[in-house]
Amino acid sequence: MNLPEHGGNLIELSKKAGCNPKEILDFSANINPLGFPEWLRPFLHSKIEDLISYPDPNYTSLKKKIHSKYGICTEQIVLGNGASELILQIPFVVQADYALIAVPCYSGYKEAISLLKIPCIEVTLKEEKQFRLDINELRDVLKSKPDQKALVFLGHPNNPTGVTLDKIEVLKIVQEFQNSVFVIDESFIHFCTNESSFLKDKTENMILIQSMTKILALPGLRIGICYASPLICSNISKRLPTWNVNSIAASVYEKAISDEDYIENSKQNIKIWKEKLIYDLSNLEFLNLFSSEANFILIKILDNKNIFDLTQELLIKYKIAVRNCENFSGLSKNFIRIAVRTPEENKKIIDAFSNIFYGTRQRLKSRKKTPSIMFQGTASNVGKSILTAALCRILSQDGIKVAPFKSQNMALNSFVTLNGEEIGRAQALQAQAAKILPDIRMNPILLKPSNEKDSQVIINGKPLNSMNFKDYDQYKPIAFEEVKKSYDSLASEYNVIIIEGAGSASEVNLKKNDIVNMKMAEYAKADVLLVGNIDHGGLFGSLLGTMETLTEWERKLVFGFIINRFRGAKELLKTGINYIEEYTNKPILGIVPYIKNLKLPEEDSLEFKSGALDDTSKLEERLDVVLIDIPRISNHTDIDALRAEPDVRVRIVRTVEDLGEPDVLILPGSKNVISDLNHLYDVGLVNKIFALSRNQKTDIVGICGGYQMLGKNIFDPYRIESDQGSIQGISLLQIETILEKNKSLKRVFATHIPTKTEVEGYEIHHGKTKSIGNTRVILLNEKAEELGHSDPTGRIWGTYIHGIFDKDEFRRKYLDQIRIRKGKSPLVKVQVSYNLEKSLDRLARYVRQSLNINLIYRKLGLG
C-alpha cells in the first residue's frame, strides 16, 4: 500500500472517490480555511502585464520590503518556489556529517537528507508527552558526536503534531553546539496565536524557513523564504535556477507583507473554529486528540477500525479527505491528521465520524437551512424583483410551498399588510406570486428616502426613525440581527425561499456592512443567480465585471447567470455566452425575453424616473391622463391600472411646458409633502394647476400627499418633514392637514359615494385631514370614516387610498364620466381586467420556458 507523501492531491483523491476534484472536502492539506485575501484577484490582474518580462533575478523589491518590515538584511534572504525547494538545498549547502530529526515530522526533511545520503538519526517524540520535544534527547545525541557536524531539522510548530518548540531551550542548544546547523521550519508559524518566531533571534548556525503558501491559501502559487547567514544564503542561491520564483508569486508576497489584518483575522477565526472543532471531536469517545498550536489536529483512532479503510470510507462515501499518518515515522498505524476548516465544513466531518462509528448520523443542534435561491444583479433595475416573483409563481404552480424574502428594500412604493405593517411593494407582489399573504418577515427592513440625505427606517413593518447614511451604516449590525430573525422564522414555515438582492452585487464601497446581497446569501446558504439586463448595454462586461469585484467566497456562491429582457435572435449571443462561461466557469442558466405589456407594478422609481413609463404616442381618441412627477414621489404604481386601459394615455409631466390641458391630472403620493409642494411652487406648476381648475375640462386628483397638497394648509408642528413648520396648499379643496407623529398604516375597504362602487387599497401617511369649508365627502370606509373629499363640482378630489384605481368597476365608471364630459360615448363594460394573477401566470410561463428550471430545481434539492 503506497500512501501519498503529502496531503492535498485533489486529482488523485477525486479519482479514488469517483467525483470532480471540486467535490472533495479536503482536510488533508493544512491551508488557511478563510481562503486567499480579498485583494488577490484584482491584484493579480494588475500584474498580468508584468508577465511579458523576466522577473528580477535578485527579487530586489521584495527583499527590500522584507528588510523594511523585519530588519533582515537582503543578503540573509533567499526566496524559493515553495519552502520545499529551499529545504531540499540545505543538506548540500551545510555538508553535515549526519542529520538529526525529531519524528514524527514533515517527510520533506528525510527526503532532502536522503539526496545527500548522509546518516539520519531519529529522536522519537513521545505520545505520552503529547509529542513535545525533550531537548535533552537532542543534546544527548549531539554530545555523543562532539567532532561531527550535525544538521538538525525541527518544526515550529511541528507537522503533523502541531506542537511548537520551547524557544528558550532551543536557543540554548543552538548556542551550545555552534558547529552544528539548526533548521527551524516555521511554515505554519503564522497560524499560531501566541506566535514566537525565531526570526529576531536567528544565529549564524540557524536556518529559518517560512512559507506563505499555507497562510495565504495559495498552494498553487508556491512561495517560500529562507533566512540564514549571508554565506549559507549565497550558497543556496547558487544551487537554485535563475528566476526560480515567478514574478506573480514575488509580487503577491510583497503585497501580503503589509496585510497584517488578514493574518491576524485568520489567526483569530481559526482559533475559534479550532476550539469548537476540538470540543465536538472530544465528544466522540473513539477519538483521542492531541493539543495543537497550528491549524491542524493530530488524532488517534481508538477503535479497532483499519485506518486505511476509514480514510477510504471518508473519501468515497462522504467525499472527505484526511491525512493518513501511517507513513509518518514515529507514529503507530492508527493516526490521522485533519486541518481546521470553516465551521460548516468542520460539522460535516463530525457527522461523518459519528455515522461511521455509531451507524447513525448525529443530529445537528441547528436546523438545516431551508433551500433557497437568490437573485442578485449587475445593477439596479435589471429585473431581480420580477424574476423573484416569476420563480415564486413557478414553484407555487408546481405545488411547492414557497415564500419571497428581501432583507432590506429601499423604495418609495410600499404596501400595507392586513395587520397594518409596511413592506416593500415588490415583496407584496412576490407574495401574491407565491399565492400567500404578504408578511412583514418577507421584508424586515424598508428604507423610504425622505430627502437627499435621510431615509425613514422601517423595521418589521413599523417606522423606527429617520437616519442619514452614516447613522444607518452604524445601525446595520443591529438591523442584520433583525433580518436573521425574520428570515429564520419565515424559512421555518416554507419549503423554499426565493431571495432578492438589492442594487448591484459589485458595490465594493458598500460591502463592509452589506446585509442584503452576498452576506445575506451566505447566511441563508443560498445559491446566487446573477442577473444582467441586456437593455442596459454592455451585458457581458457587466456580468464579468461584477464577478471580478467578488471575493472568492462570494464567487463560490454564484451558481450561474441570467440574461434578462432580450430582444432578437439568441444565436447572436453565442460568442458572448461561450466567453463568459469559459472565463468564469459558471453557466448561463437562461435568456429571458423582453415581455411586452406585462402589466405588473414596478418596484421603485428607477423605471419611472427613467422615462420608460411615459407614453408619448399620439393621443388620438384616448383620454389624456397626466401624472405630475415630484422629486420624492411615492407609490407611483397607483396609476398602473390606468395605464392598462385601452382608452387612456398616461403621461409623466415635470414642467409647465409639457403639461397642456389633460383630461385628468393626478398629484401622487410624496415622501416629503412640504418639500415636494415647494418644488411645485418653484417650477410654476402650482399656478398652472390652479389655472386648470378653472377650465371646466380637467379633473384634478390628489392621492395621499397629493390630496394634502390640494388643501388650504399643511401644518407640521413636530417638524417631521422640514423645519418650515407649515405651507400653504394649492387651495383647490377646503381642507387642512396636520402631520402627526404616528403613521397611519392599514388596509382599506371603502365605498366611492358618487359612483356607488367598492374600492380597496391601503393608507400610508402621517397626516390627519379635515374639511374646513364647502367640500363633499366622496369616500367612506366600513366605519363611516372619511377617506376623501371633492369640491362641489366633483372635478377636484382627493383621497388617502393608495391603489384606488385598481378595482376594474370603479376605474371604468370614473373614466366613463370623463368620456361623457368630453362628449364621448361611455364604454360601460370593463375593458381590461387589472388582474395581476393573469399577469403573474403569463410571466411564469415566459420564465419557465426561458430558464433551465430542471437545473435550478436540482440545486434546490427538488430534482
Swiss-Prot record:
Documented EC number(s): 4.1.1.81
BP term (GO), one: cobalamin biosynthetic process
Domain GATase cobBQ-type residues, every copy: 622-810
UniProt keywords, alphabetically: Cobalamin biosynthesis, Glutamine amidotransferase, Lyase, Multifunctional enzyme, Pyridoxal phosphate
Gene3D superfamilies per the UniProt record, alphabetical: 3.40.50.880, Aspartate Aminotransferase, domain 1, P-loop containing nucleotide triphosphate hydrolases, Type I PLP-dependent aspartate aminotransferase-like (Major domain)
HAMAP family (UniProt xref): CobQ (MF_00028)
Record protein name field: Adenosylcobalamin biosynthesis bifunctional protein CobDQ
